[in-house]
Design a protein with these regions (language model features):
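His-Asp-centered metal-binding catalytic motifs of divalent-metal-dependent phosphohydrolases/nucleases
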Residues: 43-61, 68, 90-99
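Short, well-structured alpha-helical segments
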Residues: 22, 26-29, 47, 86-94
Length: 228
């Protein structure tokens, strides 16, 4: 069943190159399997939630899908997932994600916490840098500088609505590290998640330090030292 669902998700997400494609989902699945091996949690529920956590993402499928979890519910029903398991998977998906965390909504079950950790881990470290850059480059066609503007500083206390707002002035590649990515280390639930997040966090800090050095931005290095 898992392999069949993987193939369906791969087809559904085909062509998405902004950091939320199947490659991201596959990494979240593998990270989830690694974390669940260290915890006493339901492996099937963790696996399903990991594979389906982005198939109704509001950035890709709109707010209506995100609220109803249309694709996740359909895929589970088509593959014979029982009602109780499907409900637990949907509860996990409904309670994870950074925009929800800004509202204080976090997963309450161990299974949900494992998938949340895996999802946030893939947002940081080397893969996180690549995903964030890919998303920024996708948006560069608008004519705005989506990479870095040394005169536009991050907004550190965004509400969910502000965070999701398109074309927000501070929303560029470098500022995204400060507005989200550097905060994720402290949002881990599991022991394994915290250990891996620490490694990936240090990589991002090193990347930013070198970026600011090469671009002769000592004021940004000072800012980073206050935030890291």
């Amino acid at each position: 069943m898992i392999d069949k669902i993987k193939n369906e998700v791969r087809q559904l997400m085909f062509g998405n190159n902004d950091g939320h494609g199947f490659d991201h989902i596959e990494r979240v699945y593998e990270l989830s399997m690694k974390l669940v091996a260290e915890e006493k949690a339901d492996k099937q529920i963790v696996g399903l939630a990991a594979l389906l956590h982005d198939v109704d993402d509001y950035k890709l499928f709109g707010d209506d899908n995100a609220e109803k979890l249309t694709n996740a519910r359909r895929i589970m029903e088509d593959n014979g997932v029982n009602t109780e398991t499907a409900a637990k998977v949907c509860d996990i998906i409904s309670n994870m994600g950074y925009s929800k965390a800004l509202k204080g909504i976090r997963p309450q079950t161990l299974e949900g916490q494992i998938v949340s950790d895996a999802d946030m881990l893939d947002a940081i470290g080397a893969n996180g840098v690549i995903r964030t850059l890919a998303y920024a480059l996708e948006r560069c066609h608008s004519g705005n500088n989506q990479i870095f503007d040394k005169n536009i500083w991050p907004e550190l206390f965004l509400t969910t609505e502000e965070y999701k707002k398109p074309d927000r002035p501070s929303d560029n590649f470098i500022n995204h590290f400060f507005e989200k990515l550097l905060r994720l280390k402290k949002m881990m639930f599991t022991s394994g998640g915290r250990k891996e997040a620490d490694i990936r966090h240090k990589f991002m800090v090193g990347f930013l330090e070198e970026f600011f050095r090469e671009n002769n931005c000592p004021e940004w290095i000072e800012y980073l030292n206050k935030q890291k």
